């Protein structure tokens, strides 16, 4: 059940990222790595604000990052992120 919820949330996150309009500005068309680009945090939460069985400790504390060079220790790859035309690795812990 937890795995199904986690996978559903990640699929919804992927659809949301793809639904954002692509804006080609001068900053986004540069291919060199910008400082801080390696640690772009994405917070994922589950359930309603009043609390439910979906808001267990393990699910509420899920933190994901869009990384350029792969996942760090204690993180696992959960897919890809896209910002403009650049693709990143989605790493969660």
Swiss-Prot record:
Paneth cells of the small bowel. Keywords: Antibiotic, Antimicrobial, Defensin, Disulfide bond, Secreted, Signal. The lineage of its organism: Eukaryota, Metazoa, Chordata, Craniata, Vertebrata. Residues 1-19 form the signal peptide. One of its GO terms (cellular component) is extracellular space. Disulfide bonds join 64-92, 66-81, 71-91. This is Alpha-defensin 7. Probably contributes to the antimicrobial barrier function of the small bowel mucosa. It comes from Mus musculus (Mouse). PROSITE patterns: DEFENSIN. It is found in: Secreted. GO terms for biological process: defense response to bacterium. SMART domains: Defensin_propep, DEFSN. Residues 20-58 form a propeptide. Pfam families: Defensin_1 (PF00323), Defensin_propep (PF00879). The keyword Electron transport does not apply.
